[in-house]
Amino acid sequence: MTATKHILAIHAHPDDVEILCAGTLALLAGKGHRISIVSMTPGDCGSADRGPEEIAAVRREEARQSAQRIQAEYRCAEFRDLSIFVNDSARRKVTGLLREIRPEIVLTSSSADYHCDHEATSALVQDACFAAPAPNYASEGSSAPPLPAIPHLYFVDRIEAGEDEQRDFFVDVSSVFPTKRAMLAEHRSQRDWLKKHHGIDDYLEQMERWCAQVGRRAGVQYAEGFRQCHRHSYPQVPILQELLTEYVRV
């Protein structure tokens, strides 16, 4: 029997995880694995009508409700929208967060995406995974001890990934797509904002189209794509693929 693992999905804003990997998290949760979800910011710029603190409070609660649908823990790292920078303080803060959560598997954003917060998150999380086991590296905002090892690191697709997206494998999320959709639907504050700012009329329908597009490439109805970090010193065992063998497509 496979031992229970702790999986952390950390992306820039509330709803990014739901769009890009909530189906995979639902499958893992259904197998009894522990799931944590972190947004780097509370989405404080995600409104044209509410002030930053008001919309941030709304979006934190939406993210909690979404996470609860798969019995996951939600936390916010409390950076601010458009203000995530790759620097020493941010790297130490994210390292401290990883030491507190103590995941064995980390899913994070693509290093090449449309939003600067997504790209900065990817770089910071990769650095933090490397730094978290180093006892002489002091984290910021946490006294948690170093991790025993570098976590297995995976990158999700970029938003609206095209034919040129580099992936190692897909996860067939067709069986849990209703859960993925319900998780994203908790972020109801974003419908008007995305329509006004992004030109997206229905964010649920848009997510479904994206997920179906990835599914066609995988030969299934709905899928999510992943790339494992194969850089020196990062774990190379395909642990996520092994946990979800029956759902993996290459």
Spans of features found by a protein language model:
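Metal-dependent de-N-acetylase/amidase catalytic core
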Residues: 2-8, 85-250
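Active-site rim/loop-helix segments in enzyme catalytic domains that contact anionic ligands
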Residues: 1-101, 227, 239-246
